[in-house]
């Protein structure tokens, strides 16, 4: 799902299903990891500990705050070591087009290869970021679902404001379709037809489509901190 909101307008591409993001209560409890060293004990939240292994999790709808966090982590890992792979795990129904494009452009600009791994669901902008990983290093667990579609839009206000938003959503639709065609190798005409409505795929179907390069299991799961061999 892609969502972009201004004061009076929104461009949506979020998956319209029974999914929720728990921001309060037990759903937001972050486990802590305690490490022993010569200096004593040191506690990390689990995501910071995984970041040390060059693993980033995108497990929520995508908004500006999420994008800022993901981009900051990508830039940090790029500065730390430009030759080691970064692993980006994705379980997301999508979200803001503009926030998602901030993550996308960062993935394309940083020096390390970005290994993208779908677990659960990669829908809309989540699927777009999945296929934006380094060619040959885009993966999915076998029972994951991947969905692509066109952005959804709504506008209110004066006629000229609605016209401006209509032009913007058509521009975004064309841009995303062209980038999907570039990353998947599919003809633009097929991308346009398939994204006209929600288009769901299994992991194997996404591989055949060109969204990912391999379906992984325990035997070939990427190892933290190690570079992944490109699948051709």
From Swiss-Prot:
PANTHER family: ATP-DEPENDENT CLP PROTEASE PROTEOLYTIC SUBUNIT. Belongs to the peptidase S14 family. Fourteen ClpP subunits assemble into 2 heptameric rings which stack back to back to give a disk-like structure with a central cavity, resembling the structure of eukaryotic proteasomes. Its EC number is 3.4.21.92. It catalyses: Hydrolysis of proteins to small peptides in the presence of ATP and magnesium. alpha-casein is the usual test substrate. In the absence of ATP, only oligopeptides shorter than five residues are hydrolyzed (such as succinyl-Leu-Tyr-|-NHMec, and Leu-Tyr-Leu-|-Tyr-Trp, in which cleavage of the -Tyr-|-Leu- and -Tyr-|-Trp bonds also occurs). One of its GO terms (molecular function) is ATP-dependent peptidase activity. InterPro entries: ClpP, ClpP/crotonase-like_dom_sf, ClpP/TepA, ClpP_His_AS, ClpP_Ser_AS. The active site is at 124 (nucleophile), 149. Keywords: Cytoplasm, Hydrolase, Protease, Serine protease. This is ATP-dependent Clp protease proteolytic subunit 2. It holds the Pfam family CLP_protease. Its main location: cytoplasm. It is found in: Cytoplasm. GO terms for cellular component: cytoplasm; endopeptidase Clp complex. It comes from Nostoc sp. (strain PCC 7120 / SAG 25.82 / UTEX 2576). Cleaves peptides in various proteins in a process that requires ATP hydrolysis. Has a chymotrypsin-like activity. Plays a major role in the degradation of misfolded proteins. The keyword Cytoplasm applies. GO terms for biological process: protein quality control for misfolded or incompletely synthesized proteins. The keyword Transmembrane does not apply.
């Amino acid at each position: 799902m892609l969502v972009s909101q201004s004061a009076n307008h929104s461009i949506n591409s979020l998956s319209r299903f029974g999914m929720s993001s728990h921001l309060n209560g037990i759903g937001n409890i972050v486990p802590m990891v305690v490490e022993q060293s010569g200096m004593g004990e040191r506690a990390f939240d689990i995501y910071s500990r995984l970041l040390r292994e060059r693993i980033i999790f995108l497990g929520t709808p995508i908004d500006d705050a999420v994008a800022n966090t993901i981009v900051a982590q990508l830039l940090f890992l790029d500065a730390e070591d430009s030759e080691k792979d970064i692993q980006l795990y994705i379980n997301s129904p999508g979200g803001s087009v503009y926030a998602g494009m901030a993550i996308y452009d960062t993935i394309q600009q940083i020096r390390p290869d970005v290994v993208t791994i779908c677990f659960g669901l990669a829908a809309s902008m989540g699927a777009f970021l999945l296929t934006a990983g380094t060619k040959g290093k885009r993966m999915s667990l076998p029972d994951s679902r991947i969905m692509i579609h066109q952005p959804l839009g709504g506008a209110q206000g004066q006629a000229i404001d609605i016209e401006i938003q209509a032009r913007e959503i058509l521009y975004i639709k064309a841009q995303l379709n062209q980038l999907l065609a570039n990353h998947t190798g599919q003809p633009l005409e097929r991308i346009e037809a398939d994204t006209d409505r929600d288009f769901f795929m299994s992991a194997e179907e996404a591989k055949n489509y060109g969204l990912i390069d391999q379906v992984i299991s325990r035997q070939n799961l990427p190892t933290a901190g190690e570079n992944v061999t490109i699948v051709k």
